[in-house]
Amino acid sequence: MVTPSPPGNHSLSLEAPRLHTASDLLGNHSLGLPLITALVGSRDRRGRVFSPVPVPLPTNPTTQHPTRQKLPSTLSGHRVCQAHGEPVLGLCPLLPLFCCPPHPPDPWSLERPRFCLLSKEEGKSFGFHLQQELGRAGHVVCRVDPGTSAQRQGLQEGDRILAVNNDVVEHEDYAVVVRRIRASSPRVLLTVLARHAHDVARAQLGEDAHLCPTLGPGVRPRLCHIVKDEGGFGFSVTHGNQGPFWLVLSTGGAAERAGVPPGARLLEVNGVSVEKFTHNQLTRKLWQSGQQVTLLVAGPEVEEQCRQLGLPLAAPLAEGWALPTKPRCLHLEKGPQGFGFLLREEKGLDGRPGQFLWEVDPGLPAKKAGMQAGDRLVAVAGESVEGLGHEETVSRIQGQGSCVSLTVVDPEADRFFSMVRLSPLLFLENTEAPASPRGSSSASLVETEDPSLEDTSVPSVPLGSRQCFLYPGPGGSYGFRLSCVASGPRLFISQVTPGGSAARAGLQVGDVILEVNGYPVGGQNDLERLQQLPEAEPPLCLKLAARSLRGLEAWIPPGAAEDWALASDLL
């Protein structure tokens, strides 16, 4: 006998067996519709079998929410189900069986900051393109490549980057944000917010409102290197069949001296996550470490603060404690005989390709600065050179002039940071961090606009023209900056990266852009067309006319313009 449920409960119940609501059985599918549960009975060898089936109630078809799915008609004379024999019990009129699709992305998760922990495989990128919109603060994900870490971790087109690791970057220069992401390779934690949510928050709270959750000062996971002594590593692991695991320290033991906090949660061993390890697997991993081991741990305060903020306990957030080695920052000033070293591209001891320093001459600037033969070059002027070819790396060094800042690691440090899968640039001491040259940028195209400037000294159309074809470099950049003056005649090249695609194609500072991919430049849609260039298939075809630097300086007073990035960078 079927009895109606109490008011407010959309399920039907039998005296036996007990029937749950549809949401209990199938979960909330965020359809925005009330559900009732139809009871379907069928005959088989065991007799009658009853199974609940969720059915949406009739609703006004004209009332829809943009985030809700459109449902089929809910009233029908068809039978509910015919999977196991002829149905013998159901609703009247009979309602069709509606099979819910898989869970769509939670729309509410897009309304708050999200955390994407990306990892990069050797020779590949994180899998997304970053762009700064013209005339607006912030940095936008303009494309996510399928099958990449960015896609797997939920990064979406239109997301705005609020923070890189624990550093808020929303109001930083575009080039600085690109530099931070590249310097964090092979792992980076991005805090992002969907574009529509960001726009609403800014409209309601103002441009200076703090939208990004970050850890407090000194509250960060720790990367601790422990060397075994007569008492072992100086910790034991809480017993359980599977992670998570917490550490119990021996007073005065090796772990305590290495900076492991009391009651710390164990996250990684030698760069490998132990979150899903069994206790036996963890024991074996520690035993295989030999006489020393590197642990990523989080103290109780860090764990609690991350839980409250929703932050993952991610390795790129870590600070180093008692590390066996660290990167070195070398400052060189060229002498009469040069810098005194040779840069060579080769594979390291671990098989990874890179740029290595050899033939360090005694008595010359490189040796005096502390360079050692066999050092791997990590960065030039604070900018990572990972993934760059030999020629582009040489060009970056030459572009620094007579004073060069190089970040290097010796073979031991190279092996260590490769093992823990973290960039050595994350562990530079603040006093050693090299300052990047002012105005440097990884953006491939930049637009400058200052309506206060007037062109009074040069003709509007330069004479002569030539055509250049450009292909993007390893970082997705064409290697030049494009500027203009609102009242000036044309767009012009304001900077060319040495060794980049633009330099190889023959672009020079002062060249004026006449055409881009066959379209004349000089109309009202120039900026819109430039913003679409990152999506265009290479090569980039530019028709140029030369202008002398003298004429350029007369046209644009030094320091009179401000750059906005237009094109995207592959990260």
UniProtKB/Swiss-Prot annotation:
Domain of life where this protein originates: Eukaryota
Disulfide partners: none
Region (Disordered): 52-72, 432-459
One Pfam assignment: PDZ
Membrane topology listed for this record: Peripheral membrane protein
Post-translational events: Phosphorylation at Ser-395 negatively regulates its interaction with SLC26A3.
Domain PDZ: 115-196, 223-301, 329-412, 467-548
Main location: membrane
Phosphoserine PTM positions: S395
Composition skew (Low complexity), residue ranges: 433-444
Gene Ontology biological process terms from the UniProt entry: monoatomic ion transport; negative regulation of cGMP-mediated signaling; protein localization to plasma membrane; receptor guanylyl cyclase signaling pathway; response to toxic substance; water transport
Expression (tissue specificity): Expressed in kidney and the gastrointestinal tract. Not detected in brain, heart, skeletal muscle or cells of hematopoietic origin.
GO molecular function, one term: signaling receptor binding
InterPro entries, sorted: NHER, PDZ, PDZ_sf
Keywords: Cell membrane, Cytoplasm, Membrane, Phosphoprotein, Repeat
GO CC aspect terms: apical junction complex; apical part of cell; apical plasma membrane; brush border; cytosol; plasma membrane
Protein location: Cell membrane; Cytoplasm
Subunit note: Interacts with the C-terminal region of GUCY2C. Interacts with the C-terminal region SLC9A3 and the interactions decrease in response to elevated calcium ion levels. Interacts with the C-terminal region of SLC34A1. Interacts with USP2 isoform 4. Interacts (via the third PDZ domain) with SLC26A3 (via PDZ-binding motif); interaction leads to decreased expression of SLC26A3 on the cell membrane resulting in its reduced exchanger activity.
Protein role: Acts as a regulatory protein that associates with GUCY2C and negatively modulates its heat-stable enterotoxin-mediated activation. Stimulates SLC9A3 activity in the presence of elevated calcium ions.
Record protein name field: Na(+)/H(+) exchange regulatory cofactor NHE-RF4
Naturally occurring in which organism (per UniProt): Homo sapiens
Species classification: Eukaryota, Metazoa, Chordata, Craniata, Vertebrata
